[in-house]
Amino acid sequence: MAENPYRLTEDDILEPPTTFSGKLRFLGPGFILSASIVGSGELFATTLLGAKAGFVCLWVIIFSCLVKVALQLEFGKHAIYTGRTTMQALNDLPGPRLGRGHLSIWIWLLIMSFKFLQVGGIVGGVALIFMQIPALADFGLIWWTLFTSLVVAVIVSVGRYGFLEKLSLIMIGLFTIFTLVSVIALQWTDNAFSGAEILSGLSFQLPTAAVIIAVGAFGITGVGGDEIMAYNYWLLEKGYAAHTGPRPGWTSGEAHDIWLRRARGWIRVMTLDAMAAMVCYTLVTVLFYILGAAILHRNGLVPAKTEMISQLGTIYTESLGPWAFGIFLGGALVVLFSTLLSALAAWARLFSDAFSQLGWGNFQDPESRKKSVGTCAFVFPAIWAILFLQFQAPGLMVIIGGVASAFILLIVVYAAVIMHRKWAPRELEGGQFYKTAFLLSSVAIVAVAVISSAKALGWIS
């Protein structure tokens, strides 16, 4: 791995693997992304949508997971052929500026203030899991909230990319097994589902009462705006851009052709990484939706405040026995903690880089970056803990964050269009299928943001 992956030099150039097995050895950024994606959105937003709408909105979840990948690929391509971070790219966008920063960075900072509620809800979700265990409940909610915040802060402050990648892979395996077992176990309960019910969820219907929850679920399931923005940092730290090397100053000749070949090769590796992540989080997200539709919707339950985890766990206990409750709690803990860990690692980098673009620090300098990331690793969990203890409504907090994520996607769309239309080398633009998928992603995201805005303003009920 490059000594400083955020700076491209000739010394770190590496030819991309050409075989499938060779490419598999270089996968990794998608692991961290999947660990971040599969968590609060699934345990809270996805199950809430299933509880309110039943199986009929299953297609919304699948669409949400599939449609945003083209934007993720565009951001990833940009990182590989330029070596620039997300915030460096935003700061170079055309449009108005405020001080040293592009307006998009300031808007992102404003929207992210609402996202603090979302991750505060995740911290609370982890604390509530500990509170479900009689032997641990005596410590109290405040203690477990602070404990959760401290543990994740310590891990992120000392963990580097390789450690985060391995830990994410372990958690992905655990929560995938957990969700599969949970859904399969349903078939031995009164809440068993049928193939006809699954097919009814692919009928492209959307009840009016479920519109705002569907919008929130769209923002928070699948790859979200903040996760697309964070993906570049994991690609850079894995070394994809460093292995591609700096782009020659001229656009023709042997050196440029060699660079193009390397860039295409590492973009193919990145595409495989993104597709593998998509398969993983789509599968787990669909399974969580089925849990919400089959258990909560059938029983007329729409969990509020701190009841989500306990209601799901109680129904499993009634159907399968006391042993099921412990397994459910363990799985829920892994799911939520994976999101918490990955989100903090990403936020620490995104905010440090954003502050650097505004003139506060130097993200490109390894020592300055390490200090800034370490500081954010402790400050952010403290804020999340305070917010949860103030509101104590993890489900609502996560949904609010999901709506905020839908607006962050607008920034992502604008930046991705500029990358695709103006910045990408002509030879790396992609084929017609990719261009069509990119257009569909952009239109869908803008449409959801418009619906969300109209709902918030009371223009639609």
Regions from the language model: what does each represent?
Residues 101-136, 336-354, 394, 446:
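Hydrophobic transmembrane alpha-helices that form the core helical bundles
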Residues 138-147, 323, 327, 355-390, ...:
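Loop-to-transmembrane helix boundary motifs in multi-pass membrane proteins
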Residues 170, 349, 353, 359, ...:
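C-terminal membrane-solvent junction of multi-pass transporters and transport-like membrane proteins
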Residues 70-81, 236, 242-243, 279-310:
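Extracellular/periplasmic helix-exit of transmembrane alpha-helices
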Residues 6-11, 46-48, 73-99, 130-134, ...:
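Flexible loop linkers connecting adjacent transmembrane helices
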Residues 173-233, 413-425, 448-460:
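Hydrophobic alpha-helical segments and their helix-loop junctions in multi-pass secondary transporters
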Residues 33, 61-94, 107-118, 342:
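Juxtamembrane transmembrane-helix boundary signature
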Residues 1-43, 216, 243-245, 262-271, ...:
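Membrane-interface "cap" regions at the ends of multi-pass membrane proteins
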